[in-house]
Regions:
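Short beta-strand/loop segment that forms part of the nucleotide-sugar
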Residues: 58-66, 87-90
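N-proximal low-complexity "stem/linker" segments adjacent to membrane-targeting elements
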Residues: 1-50
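Short, acidic, metal-binding catalytic loop of nucleotide-sugar glycosyltransferases
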Residues: 50-59
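Active-site-proximal specificity loops/subdomain of glycosyltransferases
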Residues: 72-116
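Catalytic-site signature of metal-activated, phosphate-bearing donor transferases
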Residues: 2-15, 99-100, 128-215
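Short acidic/polar active-site loop segments enriched in Thr and Asp
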Residues: 58, 115, 143
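Short beta-strand-to-loop acidic/aromatic patch adjacent to the donor-nucleotide binding site
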Residues: 113-127
Length: 215
């Protein structure tokens, strides 16, 4: 196993070196793929796919980790439409998030021609003020963009895209008996990154290791 992992790492480094000449060029029409790691997300997954397709995502790669609700049926629906280009049914009972997302990124790069990748959860909706994530990426020579995360306060009788109240983080959660994982916790930034020069994503998709970085 160690030998196999070392070969994989070496292969990624070799590919990253080959990528260097084109790493920081502007791409007028970048191919943008979103990876999604999901489990029991039937309530949100379809909304997520529709929202991001409208925002300019070209295709989705989805890993389903033992969903027991209607999640896989939604994945299959959009696979048949051609939106989901790769589906991985992960049956492991542990949570190897970094490994599973890395696998999707590598497939996005090597099998589906992704220039940029967004690694998302089903409850994350990536928004660009212009209305097009691809348009924003086409302007950039950077190969990694660090993005703020805002928790939105749910508003009754409104679809999520009309929610207008952002949550202000609470600095002393214990004083209000709030969970460390509540929407009132300060959210860590996440990254959008190119596939050229890619080496490794971090746990939680908060950072990415690239052979050369221009932020």
């Amino acid at each position: 196993m160690t030998s196999k992992v070392n070969r994989y790492i070496f292969h990624k480094i070799v590919c990253a070196v080959r990528d260097l000449p084109r790493t920081f060029r502007r791409l007028p029409t970048p191919r943008l793929i979103m990876t999604l790691l999901v489990k029991n997300e039937e309530e949100l997954l379809e909304k997520n796919l529709l929202f991001h397709k409208a925002m300019g995502v070209d295709a989705f790669i989805v890993t389903d980790n033992n969903s027991a609700d209607g999640t896989y049926g939604i994945i299959e629906k959009y696979r048949r439409k051609g939106w989901v280009v790769d589906v991985i049914r992960e049956t492991a009972t542990g949570y190897e998030q970094k490994e599973w997302v890395d696998r999707m990124i590598w497939r996005a790069k090597t099998s589906f021609g992704a220039d940029w990748v967004i690694n998302a959860d089903a409850d994350e909706f990536w928004y660009a003020p212009s209305g097009s994530l691809k348009k924003e990426l086409s302007k950039s020579r950077a190969n990694v963009l660090t993005c703020e995360v805002r928790s939105m306060y749910p508003e009754e009788d409104k679809p999520f895209w009309q929610w207008s109240k952002a949550v202000r983080p609470v600095t002393d959660l214990e004083a209000y008996d709030l969970s460390l994982y509540s929407l009132f916790e300060r959210q860590n930034r996440k990254v959008i990154h190119r596939t050229d020069g890619y080496l490794q994503i971090s746990m939680g998709n908060h950072k990415v290791n690239l052979l050369a970085e221009l932020i």
